[in-house]
Amino acid sequence: MGECLGEAAQCEVSGDVPVGAIVLDPEGRVIGRGRNERERHQDPTAHAEVVALRRAAEALGDWHLVGCTLVVTLEPCPMCAGAILAARVPRVVFGAWDDKAGAGGSVYDILRDRRLPHRAEVYAGVRGEECAAQLLAFFAPRR
C-alpha cells in the first residue's frame, strides 16, 4: 500500500484526485502501476486502477491477469470493478472506503457479486486511515 500512496502523491502535479494503484504478479512483484490521470489526459476512464491494469497487461503480454492482485488506495468505483473482473484479477486490496461510489462493498459489491461470471476476494481498510487522510488533504482546500 505504501507504493500506492506514493503513486497517489504524484497526482498533486496534475491536479488529479490522489488515488494510486499497483498490480502484483503471483510472486508479489509489481507489474503495473497507475495513478489517476483524468485531468492530465482529459480521459474519464484514466482511473488509477485502469491505468495499472493496462500497464500490467502490457508487461505480461496478456490481458488475463489470473493470479494477480490489485492494490489501490481507494475502494474501486463501478467502472474500475468491471475492469478488474474483466481482467480476471482474483484479489483486490484497498485502503479507504468510498461511501459515494464504492463497488467493493460500501455502496455496491460488484467485485463479489455472485450473479457475475467472475469475482474477486476483497481485503478492505488496509492503511485505510492513511489513504483517507491523503484524499481529505486534497479536497479540504477545494471545499
Language model features with spans:
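Zinc-dependent deaminase
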Residues: M1-S14, V30, P76-R143
